[in-house]
Amino acid sequence: MDEKYVPFSHKGTKISSVPGKKRGEPASKRGLSDEQVCLLSGVERLGKSILNAFNLAKPTNQDILKMKNHIQNHSFIWTDGLSSYNELIEEKQCDHKIVKTKDDYDRVNHLNNVNSFHQKIEAQYKRYKGVASKYINRYAALFTMQRECRDMDSMETLIYIKRKLKKTKCYFYIRQITTLDIFTCIPERFT
């Protein structure tokens, strides 16, 4: 588990009390401040991942405890030593290894998976030219779905997305389905 910080963004809204800022311009305060949105992420070695934005600056114990539904009891967790993780680790009775420096890294104990995930998030942010902080959790869900679908073919991806959207309700008229090409990724043999 690790956290990633991205600058707070008012993209798409015009606020008279907030001065305009050009893309790539640094934050006015140094280090972690209330201008940085915290993305808390956890990545399994087998590929499953979770990413959520909880607050500005460092996450609190309560923020990290909101992720407890995604972590199994008695699992093994590698962190960077942030003390906010301790309550979650005790509650879930997890084994814990702190990996702070390069000397702590070896073939088993490392944060490479989560750091790779963070690099992919950075690449997506650059592609979208920044994301409004208002919608950051929606984009976080998109990033995790893209990560989980990266090695699937189109049919597996479609089934995965249908399972994720199973509890949502969405209504279409027959004429919309034929004109909007909603099911274009389904091969002809399945239609």
Short names for language-model regions:
Residues 1-191:
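Residue-level recognition of single "structural anchor" positions
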